[in-house]
């Protein structure tokens, strides 16, 4: 799944006195060093991959057994005309699936921390090959289940008790049985690159237009611009962000104008790649009987398109707080006009807060207490390095970034590159939101219904961040610190709810062009994007000549209706954090039950049972009301 990290503090290097937080460790804290050899990092700070597999040598033996077992699955094919034969085949298939998942995760975790280790790279590739082989075998499994009539399936379940274990998988598969075509038609769609029926994440299978877009982006020749040190530098996607954040208006304006000017010169090519992507998605949707691309891609996770439209309609009805934010930015930065290049420079002087891992953990645990004793007991154990969930510090050849990854029957894993900043603390809270969601799902669901859908994935993580943000704001020691925390909260909501919803509306609009048979041109896309910018950002925001071309370099528009989940995820996380804090134990329990639900029910049912209905405005409104309130809080602090 493609995901975007949602930070509650993105720009800062933080430094509060250790004494601010309870539970400070008297021992000398470990000092992170990204150039340190992994061998020099104490083992207590490394995750325990041996909970997945006993050793590298055992991995080599186990992968060989799996390779043999994959070939032997074909021996079951001759008995798939009986319920007992189907049950034995499914048991063997999913047993192998479980073992491959563990071995693949073991290999991936090792490669993440030692990216230049050839053995780790080789094992990772072997794991991927085996996964691909099992996916190909899965076609036989799907065809077998889908080939049964309703009566045949009913009889099979009555006559073969061993099949009942697989009911969640069977029901999920057969829900879309009417979308499956004849064998000949299925073969043609597969040759065309069908990704509506993929066993893996839809967006893991890029079509040709997306590949062309990526090549175009990678080959862009960007001009020289003035850098942060006032010397000429080559503009790149890597330095564009820092330049756009510069406090020197000439520097940030120069970077934005250079980027958009270059992209504008290729606007027709970008319009072609995006238009062809939409046409291909529509072809696949219509081939399977869907009216729209939106309906097709949301159906995989049983999502009602009403969720998508509700997000857009609710945000559109609540853009005035964003207009207030633009006005506040104008006043604070003492600007005559607010342009795109003025949206990313900090409104408030960054506060410096340094926290070693132990103190960061204590801060998180203090902030998450509203989640209750059950959650906190498990979280405390999960964050204890001795229990092997986490790989904490950076080292030479360790891949940058952070993630949480899980497989059934084993505790989740969390990768960090912790360097004692509050940014890292926020990331840690986020990743443990994912990890705890997976833990609850794994320990409360059977194998076939533990893996929650991507639509739910960002809720637990952003709920944790929302609770951490509120705790920090409530316990700020100075007005300057509180102002900075408030400004970071505003920026998170602006960029994740408002901006991603604007993207979602743009994505809907250009797909509607294709669905209506209207040619997709750069002019049409530019006009749609400009109209949305005006509507969202309001009268105090001034568009420059090439601002309408921003759509052209956004990769999310090739991800087939995925970008909206960032906005719904953060909105839901904020709504849950607010409800849990204000309403107490009963709401907390319904929230934890949602985490425990895995994929046992549809995502919308799980959310409704927890108290959120994303087909209605309330959850989105809750997040935007927080934004509005925060604008007022910040204005009161910094506008004299």
What residues fall within each predicted segment?
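Long, K/E/R/D-enriched contiguous segments that form extended
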Residues: 328, 332-380, 390-391, 437, ...
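A well-structured
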Residues: 23-350, 361, 637-639
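Glycine- and acidic
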Residues: 49, 244-259, 296-311, 342-353, ...
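Bacterial N-terminal signal peptides that target proteins for export
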Residues: 1-10
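Post-HEXXH active-site segment of zinc metalloproteases
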Residues: 427, 438-462
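Active-site-adjacent "gating/activation" loops or surface patches in catalytic cores
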Residues: 227-247, 353-429, 433-438
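C-terminal, non-catalytic "cap/extension" segments appended to globular domains
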Residues: 39-41, 50-54, 145, 175, ...
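Bacterial N-terminal signal peptides
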Residues: 9-19
């Amino acid at each position: 799944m493609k995901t975007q990290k949602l930070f509650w503090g993105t720009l800062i290097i933080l430094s509060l006195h250790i004494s601010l937080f309870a539970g400070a460790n008297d021992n000398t804290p470990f000092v992170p060093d990204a150039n340190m050899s992994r061998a020099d990092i104490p083992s207590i700070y490394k995750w325990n991959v041996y909970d997945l597999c006993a050793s590298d040598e055992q991995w080599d033996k186990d992968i060989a057994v799996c390779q043999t077992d994959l070939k032997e699955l074909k021996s079951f094919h001759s008995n798939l005309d009986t319920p007992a034969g189907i049950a034995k085949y499914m048991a063997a298939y999913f047993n192998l699936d479980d073992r491959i998942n563990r071995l693949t995760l073991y290999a991936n975790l090792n490669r993440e921390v030692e990216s230049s280790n050839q053995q780790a790279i080789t094992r990772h590739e072997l794991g991927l090959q085996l996964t691909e082989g099992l996916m190909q075998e899965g076609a036989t499994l799907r065809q077998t289940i889908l080939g049964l009539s309703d009566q045949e399936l009913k009889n099979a379940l009555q006559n073969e008790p061993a099949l009942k274990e697989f009911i969640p998988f069977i029901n999920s598969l057969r829900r879309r049985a009417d979308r499956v075509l004849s064998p000949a038609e299925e073969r043609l769609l597969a040759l065309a690159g069908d990704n509506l029926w993929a066993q893996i994440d839809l967006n893991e299978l890029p079509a040709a237009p997306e590949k062309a877009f990526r090549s175009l982006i990678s080959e862009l020749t960007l001009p020289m611009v003035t850098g942060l040190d006032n010397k000429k530098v080559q503009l790149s996607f890597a330095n564009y962000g820092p330049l756009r954040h510069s406090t020197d208006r000439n520097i940030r304006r120069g970077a934005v104008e250079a980027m958009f000017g270059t992209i504008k010169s290729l606007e027709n090519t970008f319009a072609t790649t995006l238009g062809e992507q939409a046409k291909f998605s529509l072809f696949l949707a219509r081939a399977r009987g869907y009216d729209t691309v939106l309906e097709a891609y949301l159906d995989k996770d049983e999502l009602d398109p009403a969720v998508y439209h509700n997000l857009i309609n609710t945000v559109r009805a609540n853009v005035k707080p964003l207009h207030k934010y633009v006005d506040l930015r104008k006043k604070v930065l003492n600007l005559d006009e607010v342009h795109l290049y003025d949206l990313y420079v900090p409104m408030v002087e960054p506060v410096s807060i340094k926290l070693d891992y132990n103190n960061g953990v204590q801060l998180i645990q203090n902030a998450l207490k509203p989640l209750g004793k059950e959650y906190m007991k498990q979280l405390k154990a999960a964050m204890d390095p001795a229990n092997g969930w986490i790989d904490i510090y950076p080292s030479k050849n360790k891949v940058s970034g952070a993630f949480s990854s899980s497989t059934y029957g084993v505790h989740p894993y969390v990768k960090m590159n912790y360097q004692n900043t509050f940014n890292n603390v926020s990331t840690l809270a986020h990743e443990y939101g994912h990890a705890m969601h997976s833990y609850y799902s794994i320990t409360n669901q059977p194998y076939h219904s533990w893996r929650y859908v991507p639509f739910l994935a960002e809720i637990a993580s952003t709920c944790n961040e929302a609770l951490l943000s509120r705790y920090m704001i409530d316990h700020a020691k100075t007005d300057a610190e509180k102002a900075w925390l408030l400004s970071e909260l505003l920026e998170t909501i602006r960029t994740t709810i408002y901006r991603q919803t604007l993207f979602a509306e743009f994505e809907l609009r250009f797909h509607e062009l294709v669905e209506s048979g209207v040619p997709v041109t750069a002019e049409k896309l530019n006009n749609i994007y400009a109209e949305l910018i005006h509507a969202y950002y309001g009268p105090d925001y001034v568009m420059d000549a090439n601002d309408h071309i921003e759509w052209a370099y956004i990769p999310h528009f090739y991800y087939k209706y995925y970008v909206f989940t960032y906005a719904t995820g953060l909105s839901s996380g904020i709504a849950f954090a607010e409800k849990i804090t204000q309403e107490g134990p009963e709401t907390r329990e319904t929230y934890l039950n949602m985490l425990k639900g895995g994929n046992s029910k549809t995502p919308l049912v799980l959310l409704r049972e927890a108290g959120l209905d994303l087909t209605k405005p309330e959850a989105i409104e809750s997040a935007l009301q927080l934004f509005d309130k925060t604008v007022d809080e910040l204005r009161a602090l910094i506008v004299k």
